[in-house]
């Protein structure tokens, strides 16, 4: 009986289910997916129109979620790696509390946020490889973590 308990205890971390990838889009030059990177697993819906290509596309990323706190102040901590090389942490402030560019700024706790954010990769050349971006959304005066998402981008073609 002791070997069975020892064996099952040692292998349980190995046999647990890996973090489920949420499909985001699959284009001619990139596969993009995301998963949760914290235990909160906050319900969020992300899609793009058109599917993101890293070769000069532009469009909109659609985001829908219900914030657990007021969005008067909102910023993202971005941790990015390219082919396993870590880049410096980046802090991207979206909602300053005044003269904000985005309609969802000042949304209150419990209100549905449904927004479209424009993107463009015109003139940017991405080398092929494996990109990872962890995005932590931090909101409010108390700097509460709203959610954490781990984006994976596999760029299949070298455009240089």
From Swiss-Prot:
It is found in: Secreted, Extracellular space; Secreted. The keyword Ribonucleoprotein does not apply. This is Lymphocyte antigen 96. InterPro entries: Ig_E-set (IPR014756), LY96 (IPR039217), ML_dom (IPR003172). Glycans are attached at residues 26, 114, 150. The lineage of its organism: Eukaryota, Metazoa, Chordata, Craniata, Vertebrata. It comes from Mus musculus (Mouse). One of its GO terms (biological process) is detection of lipopolysaccharide. GO terms for cellular component: extracellular region; lipopolysaccharide receptor complex; plasma membrane. Residues 1-18 form the signal peptide. Its main location: secreted. Keywords: Disulfide bond, Glycoprotein, Immunity, Inflammatory response, Innate immunity, Secreted, Signal. SUPFAM superfamilies: E set domains. Coiled coil: none annotated. Residues 119-123 are annotated as: Interaction with lipopolysaccharide. Highly expressed in spleen, bone marrow, thymus, liver, kidney, ovary and decidua. Detected at lower levels in testis, small intestine and skin. SMART domains: ML. N-glycosylated. Disulfide bonds join 25-51, 37-148, 95-105. Heterogeneous homomer formed from homodimers; disulfide-linked. Belongs to the lipopolysaccharide (LPS) receptor, a multi-protein complex containing at least CD14, LY96 and TLR4. Binds to the extracellular domain of TLR4. Binds to the extracellular domain of TLR2. Ligand binding induces interaction with TLR4 and oligomerization of the complex. Binds bacterial lipopolysaccharide (LPS). Cooperates with TLR4 in the innate immune response to bacterial lipopolysaccharide (LPS), and with TLR2 in the response to cell wall components from Gram-positive and Gram-negative bacteria. Enhances TLR4-dependent activation of NF-kappa-B. Cells expressing both LY96 and TLR4, but not TLR4 alone, respond to LPS. GO terms for molecular function: lipopolysaccharide binding; lipopolysaccharide immune receptor activity; Toll-like receptor 4 binding.
């Amino acid at each position: 009986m002791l070997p069975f308990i020892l064996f099952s205890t040692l292998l349980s971390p190995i046999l647990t289910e890996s973090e489920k990838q949420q499909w985001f889009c699959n284009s001619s030059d990139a596969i993009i997916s995301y998963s949760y990177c914290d235990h909160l697993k906050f319900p969020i819906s992300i899609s793009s129109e058109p599917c993101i290509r890293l070769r000069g596309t532009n469009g909109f990323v659609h985001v829908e979620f219900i914030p657990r706190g007021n969005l008067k102040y909102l910023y993202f901590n971005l941790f990015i790696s390219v082919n396993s090389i870590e880049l410096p942490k980046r802090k991207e402030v979206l909602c300053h509390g005044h003269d904000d560019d985005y309609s969802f700024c000042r949304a209150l706790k419990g209100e549905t946020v449904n927004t479209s954010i424009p993107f463009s990769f015109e003139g940017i050349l991405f080398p092929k490889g494996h990109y990872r971006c962890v995005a932590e959304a931090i909101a409010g005066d108390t700097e509460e973590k709203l959610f954490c998402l781990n984006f994976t981008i596999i760029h299949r073609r070298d455009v240089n």
